[in-house]
Protein backbone atom coordinates (compact mmCIF):
# COMPACT_ATOMS: atom_id res chain seq x y z
CA UNK A 1 0.00 0.00 0.00
CA UNK A 2 2.63 2.57 1.11
CA UNK A 3 6.29 2.03 0.22
CA UNK A 4 9.04 4.36 1.43
CA UNK A 5 12.47 3.45 0.08
CA UNK A 6 15.65 5.10 1.39
CA UNK A 7 14.32 8.64 1.39
CA UNK A 8 16.43 11.64 2.32
CA UNK A 9 15.15 15.11 3.09
CA UNK A 10 17.21 18.23 3.71
CA UNK A 11 16.25 21.69 4.86
CA UNK A 12 19.18 23.88 3.81
CA UNK A 13 22.25 22.27 5.42
CA UNK A 14 20.30 20.07 7.84
CA UNK A 15 19.48 16.51 6.80
CA UNK A 16 16.21 15.64 8.53
CA UNK A 17 15.62 12.20 7.01
CA UNK A 18 18.63 9.98 6.39
CA UNK A 19 17.67 7.03 4.25
CA UNK A 20 14.37 6.06 5.86
CA UNK A 21 12.54 2.99 4.54
CA UNK A 22 9.06 1.89 5.59
CA UNK A 23 6.44 -0.50 4.22
CA UNK A 24 2.80 -0.35 5.30
CA UNK A 25 0.33 -2.90 3.97
CA UNK A 26 -3.35 -2.17 3.41
CA UNK A 27 -5.25 -2.29 6.69
CA UNK A 28 -2.16 -1.98 8.86
CA UNK A 29 -1.62 0.57 11.62
CA UNK A 30 1.96 1.75 12.11
CA UNK A 31 2.89 4.11 14.94
CA UNK A 32 5.95 6.35 14.72
CA UNK A 33 7.50 7.29 18.03
CA UNK A 34 10.61 9.22 18.99
CA UNK A 35 11.83 12.53 20.39
CA UNK A 36 11.00 15.89 18.87
CA UNK A 37 13.13 16.66 15.84
CA UNK A 38 13.66 13.02 14.88
CA UNK A 39 11.92 13.41 11.50
CA UNK A 40 8.51 11.84 12.22
CA UNK A 41 6.35 14.72 10.97
CA UNK A 42 8.62 15.34 7.98
CA UNK A 43 8.25 11.69 6.99
CA UNK A 44 4.45 12.02 7.01
CA UNK A 45 4.59 15.21 4.95
CA UNK A 46 6.79 13.51 2.38
CA UNK A 47 4.41 10.55 2.12
CA UNK A 48 1.51 12.95 1.53
CA UNK A 49 3.48 15.04 -0.96
CA UNK A 50 3.37 18.17 1.20
CA UNK A 51 7.18 18.08 1.25
CA UNK A 52 9.45 16.98 -1.58
CA UNK A 53 11.99 14.31 -0.67
CA UNK A 54 15.47 14.80 -2.09
CA UNK A 55 16.44 11.16 -2.65
CA UNK A 56 14.72 7.81 -2.59
CA UNK A 57 11.21 6.80 -3.64
CA UNK A 58 7.71 6.81 -2.18
CA UNK A 59 4.77 4.98 -3.71
CA UNK A 60 1.14 4.83 -2.62
CA UNK A 61 -0.86 1.98 -4.08
CA UNK A 62 1.75 1.66 -6.82
CA UNK A 63 1.79 5.36 -7.78
CA UNK A 64 4.92 7.45 -7.23
CA UNK A 65 4.62 10.39 -4.84
CA UNK A 66 6.56 13.47 -5.85
CA UNK A 67 5.60 17.14 -5.79
CA UNK A 68 6.40 17.44 -9.51
CA UNK A 69 4.12 14.57 -10.44
CA UNK A 70 1.17 15.60 -12.58
CA UNK A 71 -0.94 13.26 -10.46
CA UNK A 72 0.06 14.74 -7.09
CA UNK A 73 -3.43 16.10 -6.35
CA UNK A 74 -5.00 12.70 -7.00
CA UNK A 75 -2.36 11.05 -4.82
CA UNK A 76 -3.03 13.48 -1.98
CA UNK A 77 -6.70 12.58 -2.11
CA UNK A 78 -5.75 8.94 -1.56
CA UNK A 79 -3.80 9.79 1.60
CA UNK A 80 -5.67 11.91 4.14
CA UNK A 81 -3.86 13.83 6.85
CA UNK A 82 -4.92 14.91 10.33
CA UNK A 83 -2.73 17.58 11.89
CA UNK A 84 -1.98 18.59 15.46
CA UNK A 85 -3.85 21.88 15.15
CA UNK A 86 -7.18 20.86 13.55
CA UNK A 87 -6.93 23.51 10.75
CA UNK A 88 -10.70 23.93 10.47
CA UNK A 89 -12.21 26.89 8.66
CA UNK A 90 -13.39 29.13 11.54
CA UNK A 91 -16.21 30.70 9.51
CA UNK A 92 -17.73 27.36 8.50
CA UNK A 93 -19.84 24.96 10.55
CA UNK A 94 -18.74 21.41 11.31
CA UNK A 95 -20.92 20.15 8.45
CA UNK A 96 -19.53 22.74 6.03
CA UNK A 97 -15.94 21.93 7.01
CA UNK A 98 -16.49 18.26 6.22
CA UNK A 99 -18.27 19.10 2.94
CA UNK A 100 -15.51 21.40 1.69
CA UNK A 101 -13.22 18.83 0.05
CA UNK A 102 -15.91 16.70 -1.60
CA UNK A 103 -17.64 19.79 -2.99
CA UNK A 104 -14.67 21.74 -4.34
CA UNK A 105 -12.06 19.05 -4.99
CA UNK A 106 -14.09 15.95 -5.88
CA UNK A 107 -16.95 18.01 -7.37
CA UNK A 108 -19.64 16.00 -5.60
CA UNK A 109 -23.24 17.13 -5.79
CA UNK A 110 -24.08 19.31 -2.79
CA UNK A 111 -26.84 17.02 -1.51
CA UNK A 112 -24.56 13.99 -1.64
CA UNK A 113 -21.69 15.83 0.04
CA UNK A 114 -23.94 17.04 2.85
CA UNK A 115 -25.45 13.61 3.42
CA UNK A 116 -22.01 11.98 3.52
CA UNK A 117 -20.74 14.68 5.89
CA UNK A 118 -23.72 14.17 8.18
CA UNK A 119 -23.05 10.43 8.28
CA UNK A 120 -19.35 10.92 9.04
CA UNK A 121 -20.02 13.40 11.83
CA UNK A 122 -22.42 10.91 13.35
CA UNK A 123 -19.71 8.25 13.03
CA UNK A 124 -17.27 10.36 15.10
CA UNK A 125 -19.97 11.12 17.68
CA UNK A 126 -20.84 14.65 16.55
CA UNK A 127 -24.23 14.19 14.94
CA UNK A 128 -25.59 16.78 17.38
CA UNK A 129 -22.97 19.39 16.38
CA UNK A 130 -23.59 19.69 12.63
CA UNK A 131 -24.26 23.43 12.76
CA UNK A 132 -21.66 24.33 15.39
CA UNK A 133 -18.72 26.56 14.47
CA UNK A 134 -15.18 25.61 15.56
CA UNK A 135 -15.22 28.28 18.27
CA UNK A 136 -18.23 26.50 19.79
CA UNK A 137 -16.45 23.13 19.95
CA UNK A 138 -13.91 21.73 22.38
CA UNK A 139 -10.48 20.78 21.09
CA UNK A 140 -11.43 17.11 21.07
CA UNK A 141 -14.58 17.85 19.09
CA UNK A 142 -12.63 19.96 16.60
CA UNK A 143 -10.15 17.14 16.07
CA UNK A 144 -13.01 14.70 15.49
CA UNK A 145 -14.39 17.08 12.85
CA UNK A 146 -10.92 17.08 11.28
CA UNK A 147 -10.97 13.27 11.19
CA UNK A 148 -14.43 13.30 9.58
CA UNK A 149 -13.12 15.82 7.05
CA UNK A 150 -10.25 13.49 6.14
CA UNK A 151 -12.65 10.54 5.80
CA UNK A 152 -14.93 12.57 3.52
CA UNK A 153 -12.32 12.34 0.76
CA UNK A 154 -12.56 8.51 0.92
CA UNK A 155 -8.79 8.04 1.31
CA UNK A 156 -7.01 4.72 1.13
CA UNK A 157 -4.88 5.71 4.12
CA UNK A 158 -4.79 8.42 6.77
CA UNK A 159 -1.69 9.97 8.33
CA UNK A 160 -2.03 11.34 11.86
CA UNK A 161 0.56 13.86 13.05
CA UNK A 162 0.35 13.83 16.87
CA UNK A 163 -3.44 14.28 16.75
CA UNK A 164 -3.82 14.54 20.54
CA UNK A 165 -0.80 16.69 21.41
CA UNK A 166 -2.75 19.97 21.37
CA UNK A 167 -5.60 18.62 23.53
CA UNK A 168 -6.29 18.92 27.22
CA UNK A 169 -5.70 15.53 28.88
CA UNK A 170 -9.39 14.91 29.53
CA UNK A 171 -10.16 15.25 25.80
CA UNK A 172 -7.52 12.86 24.50
CA UNK A 173 -9.62 9.72 25.01
CA UNK A 174 -12.49 10.78 22.76
CA UNK A 175 -10.13 11.26 19.81
CA UNK A 176 -8.26 8.01 20.45
CA UNK A 177 -11.59 6.15 20.58
CA UNK A 178 -12.43 7.35 17.07
CA UNK A 179 -8.98 6.31 15.85
CA UNK A 180 -9.38 2.88 17.46
CA UNK A 181 -12.63 2.39 15.59
CA UNK A 182 -10.99 3.37 12.30
CA UNK A 183 -8.27 0.81 12.96
CA UNK A 184 -10.84 -1.90 13.73
CA UNK A 185 -12.67 -0.94 10.52
CA UNK A 186 -9.50 -1.67 8.54
CA UNK A 187 -8.29 1.84 7.70
CA UNK A 188 -4.60 1.98 6.80
CA UNK A 189 -3.01 4.42 9.25
CA UNK A 190 0.40 5.87 10.06
CA UNK A 191 0.29 7.65 13.42
CA UNK A 192 2.91 9.89 14.99
CA UNK A 193 2.11 9.68 18.68
CA UNK A 194 3.34 9.81 22.26
CA UNK A 195 0.32 7.78 23.41
CA UNK A 196 2.11 4.52 24.11
CA UNK A 197 -0.95 2.70 25.44
CA UNK A 198 -2.74 3.45 22.16
CA UNK A 199 0.25 2.21 20.16
CA UNK A 200 0.44 -0.99 22.22
CA UNK A 201 -3.28 -1.69 21.78
CA UNK A 202 -3.86 -0.72 18.16
CA UNK A 203 -0.61 -0.71 16.18
CA UNK A 204 0.56 -3.65 14.12
CA UNK A 205 4.07 -2.20 14.21
CA UNK A 206 5.91 0.57 16.01
CA UNK A 207 8.92 2.40 14.57
CA UNK A 208 11.29 4.39 16.76
CA UNK A 209 12.88 7.32 14.94
CA UNK A 210 15.98 9.12 16.16
CA UNK A 211 18.02 11.74 14.31
CA UNK A 212 16.38 11.08 10.96
CA UNK A 213 16.66 7.30 10.97
CA UNK A 214 14.52 4.37 12.10
CA UNK A 215 16.63 2.96 14.93
CA UNK A 216 14.29 0.11 15.71
CA UNK A 217 10.97 -1.30 14.56
CA UNK A 218 8.88 -4.29 15.44
CA UNK A 219 5.57 -5.60 16.70
CA UNK A 220 4.07 -3.10 19.13
CA UNK A 221 4.25 -5.26 22.25
CA UNK A 222 7.78 -6.43 21.48
CA UNK A 223 9.23 -2.99 20.89
CA UNK A 224 7.41 -1.25 23.74
CA UNK A 225 8.03 -3.97 26.31
CA UNK A 226 11.39 -5.38 25.15
CA UNK A 227 13.23 -2.66 23.20
CA UNK A 228 16.66 -3.67 21.94
CA UNK A 229 18.28 -0.37 20.95
CA UNK A 230 19.70 1.72 23.82
CA UNK A 231 18.13 4.90 22.46
CA UNK A 232 14.72 3.22 22.29
CA UNK A 233 15.05 2.07 25.88
CA UNK A 234 16.10 5.54 27.03
CA UNK A 235 13.20 7.20 25.19
CA UNK A 236 10.62 4.80 26.58
CA UNK A 237 11.91 5.25 30.11
CA UNK A 238 11.26 8.95 29.73
CA UNK A 239 7.74 8.74 28.33
CA UNK A 240 6.29 5.72 30.08
CA UNK A 241 5.19 5.59 33.68
CA UNK A 242 7.30 3.44 35.93
CA UNK A 243 4.65 0.71 35.91
CA UNK A 244 4.80 0.54 32.11
CA UNK A 245 8.55 0.84 31.75
CA UNK A 246 10.18 -1.87 29.61
CA UNK A 247 12.48 -4.44 31.10
CA UNK A 248 16.23 -4.00 30.64
Task: Tell me the role of every PLM-derived stretch.
Residues 210, 217, 221-248:
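C-terminal boundary and immediately downstream tail of ABC-type ATPase nucleotide-binding domains
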